[in-house]
Amino acid sequence: MSDTEQERWSRVKGRLRSTVGEDIYSSWFARMDLESVHGESVRLSVPTRFLKSWIQAHYAERVLSCWQAELPDVHRIDLTVRSAMRCAAPVREAPATDARHPERSEGRNGVELKTVATAPASANHDALGGSPLDPRLTFQSFVTGRSNTLAHAAARQVAEGRRGDSVMFNPLYIHAGVGLGKTHLLQAVTWAGNAGTERRVLYLTAEKFMYGFVAALKTQTALAFKEALRGIDVLVIDDLQFLQGKSTQAEFCHTLNALIDAGRQVVIAADRPPSDLESLDDRVRSRLAGGLVVEMGSLGEELRLGILRSRVEAARVHHASFDVPEPVLDYLAKAITHNGRDLEGAINRLLAHSKLNAQPVTLEMAEREVRDLVRPQEPRRIKIEDIQRVVARQYNVSRSDLLSSRRTANVVRPRQVAMYLAKTLTLRSLPEIGRRFGGRDHTTVLHAVRKIEALVSKDTTLSDEVELLKRQLQE
């Protein structure tokens, strides 16, 4: 793909993000890739059939219009499904070691480095239609840092439990943005849990759960489907934000309750906290919030450097002469800040260029090969949706509460704080802010802003809360 096409694709993605909003973009479009542009046709790809069908049904016209704003001659969008990875039979995990030393190595600034180990054997309960597992995604290959330490520790404790043990974190709910390691941890739990024969561990994407339930209804095997699921010792559900349909959500809620009440473990991942999963039934959100909810934050520079080093070590398993000098790793860690997938992609590009051209990796080569992955270092643009999400989490209310007409004290103050932050941290007008808060009048927003301004000047507790929220939004 040419640099021009990549630049166009970046602009189209930015236009699409502005059109649908950050939450919808993250849920449905973050994993969409550009495959090719030919005349009046653009070919895009997504990883699953579910994403393809949903985007075609709900967003096809918006995607086309965003492309036409860039290339007016485009009249057709072809959406395809990328081939799913078919794993070869894996072997048991080996102890994590550095490729050059027999002991585990520590990266600079305390980032733990691990080589990518192969995974233990597991059928993932194919009789129940478990989702495919990637043999690279084990605890051995997971790089820990400040932003993911708690999630890693909780997942590891769950994986090391035995049948009959008391369950401490149930459900364990992990949320994070795209490419920050949620799926890696969930699959690591599955591999480790299935390493022995004692416990039955099943990994399912929300899409797979949904399709399995619908298929069971059509074939009149719903009872067998339910009984099989409830016989699992550890149920692992990924991408919960994609769970759709009232009957499917009701069945998921029943399964969740049955497993937890029976002392079985449930592990779930999504791209947002339970309170922000507004498409889910209130009962499901309440049950999820009652467990351990852990957020995996953005990757700090130390962690990015650790991930890069681990990917280089993994590449050396098959390409022993491959080497990335330390200055290049430092540059990549500073320049590529979005997510772990971009970091892995950068190493793959350097490996390909080095091998195909028989050239050593240099800083100049790296700057040239990864320039489309480097984002300008500009202040983060804060959206009203971000403010609503962060404020709702801070005050333990839902985003829908902030948009509702409820006037209880535990909702009014967070709503006023959110409106105040929207006025001070964004360029939106008072009428626009009012519309984003459930269609309120601009005078309501003005009252909230003046109210919080007055309180902040004399209430140190509230002042500290507001400053904390500002820091969280600006990070």
Swiss-Prot record:
Family statement drawn from the similarity comment of this UniProt entry: Belongs to the DnaA family.
Any Pfam family hit: Bac_DnaA
Keywords assigned by UniProt, alphabetized: ATP-binding, Cytoplasm, DNA replication, DNA-binding, Lipid-binding, Nucleotide-binding
UniProt region (Domain IV, binds dsDNA), positions on chain: 355-475
Major location (coarse): cytoplasm
Region (Domain III, AAA+ region): 132-354
One GO BP: regulation of DNA replication
UniProt entry tagged with the keyword Cytoplasm: yes
Region: Domain II, residue numbers: 73-131
UniProt name for this protein: Chromosomal replication initiator protein DnaA
SMART domains: AAA, Bac_DnaA_C
Binding site for ATP: 179, 181-183
GO cellular component: cytoplasm; plasma membrane
Localization per Swiss-Prot or TrEMBL: Cytoplasm
CDD domains, sorted: AAA, Bac_DnaA_C
Function: Plays an essential role in the initiation and regulation of chromosomal replication. ATP-DnaA binds to the origin of replication (oriC) to initiate formation of the DNA replication initiation complex once per cell cycle. Binds the DnaA box (a 9 base pair repeat at the origin) and separates the double-stranded (ds)DNA. Forms a right-handed helical filament on oriC DNA; dsDNA binds to the exterior of the filament while single-stranded (ss)DNA is stabiized in the filament's interior.
Annotated region described as Domain I, interacts with DnaA modulators, given as residue ranges: 1-73
Subunit structure: Oligomerizes as a right-handed, spiral filament on DNA at oriC.
